[in-house]
């Protein structure tokens, strides 16, 4: 998790709870309204086929595996020690406590997924939702030029094969499960933002970016633990993260 903190900077503006809540609701409405025939057509045109390279199961290629609440139930049944608070906590209050929208799978020292062995998933039949839909997606993000638009696939031309001639029923199923994942993810994010808003209002708290930055620097230098509240099933679970031992 320590390295992950170095990879992403969250601006003060984006950490306004109301702003992020509004954006998440708009994104959900956009996903729900995206034309199904268009999405199916894009999937069919791409014709992606997995070639079992396992690159998507590494931190270098895919950063982390975020878990929906339903995923966490399954993963904890398999191995409760295989999860950790997701990287990039969204908020930090004035007392230095962090708040993050969910859990992620742990990784091995080499950066590969904790469940990856010999380029194969040990829990394939029970793998998390994002692993089932990857590399497909349905959300808006900026391209290299900064232009924001809809994206339907990750890592284009970086793995797998393309133009494989998928049949219509397969494309429709891919579209269905991908849309379902994106909607579930956004609903979890909306629930998280609403829960943080209520918690902050009730307890006289607020997000303070300078405290966020200072605590992260101290953590990366091994000077402190982090108190992280992880959103799960409508509530927060407290986790204490210890700094990496050199």
Annotate each PLM feature:
Residues 1-246:
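Short loop/turn segments that flank or connect secondary-structure elements
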